[in-house]
Amino acid sequence: MTLIALTGMPAAGKGEVAAVAQQRGWAVHRIGDLVWEETERRGLELAPASVGAVANGEREAHGYGVWASRSLERIDALRAAGSHVLIDGMRGERELAVFRTAYGDALVTVAVVASAEQRLARVQQRGRIDDGDAAAF
């Protein structure tokens, strides 16, 4: 089964690519969902500051590949079920290294790119809890 990892700046359009993949029957694993789950598990508000603090705190404590490592079990289950899998939101070389070690050449990486102006406009429109405001962007 095909395995694609998306990467790109916030609001570049990764979610749109993931939505199209899902409409075509692909399983989508959004790495950010793990961060949201951990934030909620700790009893923290799903707000940009707390989500960011959890994400970065775990990276500092366990290494920058921590969220990719924690994704492997879910991705493996999706693949075992026979699904093509799209990984939404891979960040940085350490996460790529985790996925390359686990999946080798079966992993295809795709960068989604949009201008800063376009990304800011999307952030202001979509109102996602982890986006923050224009000043944070």
Regions found by a protein language model. Name each.
Residues A12:
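ATP-binding Walker
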Residues M1-I4:
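Extreme N-terminal starter segment of soluble prokaryotic enzymes
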Residues A27-L86, M90-V98, A134-A135:
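ATP-dependent small-molecule kinase phosphotransfer cores
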Residues Q23-V28, T109:
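Conserved beta-strand scaffold positions in the cores of enzyme catalytic domains, especially
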Residues Q23, A80-G82, G104-D105:
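Short, well-ordered coil/turn elements that cap or connect secondary structure elements
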